[in-house]
Amino acid sequence: MNFFEGTVLGLVQGLTEFLPVSSSAHLRIAAALAGWEDPGAAFTAVTQIGTETAVLIYFRRDIARIVAAWARSLTRREMRKDPDARTGWLVILGTLPIGLLGVTLQDAIEGPFRDLRLIATTLIVLGLILGGADWYASKGRPQGRHSPLRPRKVLEDLSVRDGLLYGLAQSAALIPGVSRSGATISGGLLLGYTREAAARYSFLLAMPAVLASGVFELRSIGGKDADVAWGPTILATFVAFVTGYAAIAWFLRYISTRSFAPFVLYRVGLGLLLFSLLVGGALSPDAGAPPG
């Protein structure tokens, strides 16, 4: 990988990480279309350190409040009823499924899961699920905690059951094409949360798992047998941070007044286009895969 490829892939990562369209799928597809070698799961994980740093900065006040309340709850039992402390505990709970599955399925994540046929399928299927969840969330049910008519839930309503279900939804994102935010936002909408609450919790929930995965995969970058060098990876991570911060701000403003319909149409369209390229022979399912 050279610096130009690193810049392009960092831009793709930053622009798509927080949108429900799957950044890992876009990195895989972009490299295949450009005729570049698949950047691999390790490169994806490391560049996500940049986008998660954007989350840390964007939500710094929320995160500081949650961490402080959680820390106090370790020694003060009464603090465990505090909404921020409970959110901290539930983020930990929700991280367990993807952590366990990520270790168990590591070989599949770095191999078979990156097949472009599987990615095309998950783009379409999860797009339809997101569309169904968004329709369910907006079918005449008011948004807001204080509405007298079946109000949708906000983060203060988060329960142990919901936290675990959020975590299970996040685990699906181990397959490129699913989208971490797409899976968890869909899960949140189906559980009855507002669009804004589902998105904000999705971003918070991703942080421990994504940062841990990125740090773990640092060992795969820049070594003698590594496919990706340090220079392009660092550049890609920085570009992902800058564009990711802008994407968070835009996305949260967008969903406060609009539906996920454009993302649903985009996912389905991209999946169908990818299938047509595969069937027509313009791309092979393992395009860009390293030999061996």
Curated annotation (Swiss-Prot):
Annotated EC: 3.6.1.27
Domain of life: Bacteria
Keywords of this entry: Antibiotic resistance, Cell membrane, Cell shape, Cell wall biogenesis/degradation, Hydrolase, Membrane, Peptidoglycan synthesis, Transmembrane, Transmembrane helix
Record bears the keyword Membrane: yes
Membrane topology: Multi-pass membrane protein
Enzyme class: hydrolase
Transmembrane segments: 89-109, 118-138, 203-223, 232-252, 263-283
A cellular-component GO term for this protein: plasma membrane
GO biological-process terms attached to the record: cell wall organization; peptidoglycan biosynthetic process; regulation of cell shape; response to antibiotic
Subcellular location: Cell membrane
Family: Belongs to the UppP family.
Note: Bacitracin is thought to be involved in the inhibition of peptidoglycan synthesis by sequestering undecaprenyl diphosphate, thereby reducing the pool of lipid carrier available.
Reported function: Catalyzes the dephosphorylation of undecaprenyl diphosphate (UPP). Confers resistance to bacitracin.
Protein name as catalogued: Undecaprenyl-diphosphatase 2
